[in-house]
């Protein structure tokens, strides 16, 4: 494949933007390959500015659960644009999406729309602190909750890709109120609560960690968090920005049958447009302005384009959609295991619904430390070879791959064959 147009575009971009990108992972640094500039998408395919075609498993990092350029979503967005892009006042589209979210997520009795997942998590922490009158938040090593100061501590995803354990610029006074413990380790949580329980406002967790690859919770972990937060009067916060409506029809909390106090959403609920949301029990949510004293606001929060796109996206998801995802996911998971075994290369495949992660190690992978044991050099080689075969994978070991309703069994079979071909060149 040729990338001459992407290389020229990146050279210009580096003159204009830090690193030439507006989000670090797009620089493709961890896979030692030139950044790829995309032109358009269609269904399960994405096309770069050099004309190369790929089966897309990035899907804009998760939001495009229906695939690219879904006809119904695009039509409704066009209708919304014809009326105007933003009004600074409420619209009926906000009511429609809010009602659908509340209907699908039983733990959410009221919801507040924002413009990004980072906004959702930082506002949720302020709400948790204001509601409980406490200061400390517990998060898990390798879980990424956006780039707000108090959560950019021992995060996964982009900072892991760049080899940064933490980000400079986070004040010590803020960092001291964030307690970090290993993911899937209930004993560590118990120790944290024994020492700081009276001042812990909440525990925030990705119910499926999607920013250290894909790492599902071990049996009893999420329920254990529910039990200990209840015992200490702290709030359990599920960051479902990635897992929301991707792991299951009722999100990860429905899939695992564990009810949080507050939930953060994003990605899928915008259908590819910028969006975030957080919600929970009425008694907690009513503490937010204008009904309460905890301030939160946003110029473009609930903007009609994102609300329309999100509503039309969620409207197309049914319980049967997730049966289809499981069918494709089973096929891809087993295919990966078989083809890597054929080439005598160790692999661990983790999956939760339409989220799939593979690690080039013998496993298991249940936490960030184990995820870091993956063969990163071979992962980079694999990425480059798969791109040559027309498969677009996340350019980072610490990101998951995603399925959409546009993917087919033929796509999966082609992808497995591509892995076979790639491995034959590498080993």
UniProtKB/Swiss-Prot annotation:
Fetch the InterPro entries from UniProt.
Answer: 4pyrrol_synth_GluAld_NH2Trfase (IPR004639), Aminotrans_3 (IPR005814), Aminotrans_3_PPA_site (IPR049704), PyrdxlP-dep_Trfase (IPR015424), PyrdxlP-dep_Trfase_major (IPR015421), PyrdxlP-dep_Trfase_small (IPR015422)
Name of the molecule in the record: Glutamate-1-semialdehyde 2,1-aminomutase 2
Q: What is its EC number?
A: 5.4.3.8
Q: What cofactor does this chain's UniProt record say it requires?
A: pyridoxal 5'-phosphate
Concerning NCBIfam families, the annotation shows: hemL (TIGR00713), PRK00062.1 (NF000818)
| Major location category of this protein | cytoplasm
Tell me which family the UniProt entry assigns to this protein.
Answer: Belongs to the class-III pyridoxal-phosphate-dependent aminotransferase family. HemL subfamily.
**Lineage summary:** Bacteria, Bacillati, Bacillota, Bacilli, Bacillales
Alphabetical list of HAMAP family matching this protein = HemL_aminotrans_3
Q: Which PROSITE patterns match?
A: AA_TRANSFER_CLASS_3 (PS00600)
GO CC annotations, alphabetized: cytoplasm
- Pathway this chain belongs to: Porphyrin-containing compound metabolism; protoporphyrin-IX biosynthesis; 5-aminolevulinate from L-glutamyl-tRNA(Glu): step 2/2
According to the record's subunit comment, the protein's assembly and interactions are: Homodimer.
Q: Which UniProt keywords apply?
A: Cytoplasm, Isomerase, Porphyrin biosynthesis, Pyridoxal phosphate
Residue numbers bearing the N6-(pyridoxal phosphate)lysine modification: 267
Mention one GO biological process in which this protein takes part, according to its record. protoporphyrinogen IX biosynthetic process
Describe the reaction catalysed, as an equation: (S)-4-amino-5-oxopentanoate = 5-aminolevulinate
- State the compartments where it is located: Cytoplasm
Q: Which CDD domains match?
A: OAT_like
Supply the Pfam families for this chain. Aminotran_3 (PF00202)
Q: Which GO terms describe its molecular function?
A: glutamate-1-semialdehyde 2,1-aminomutase activity; pyridoxal phosphate binding; transaminase activity
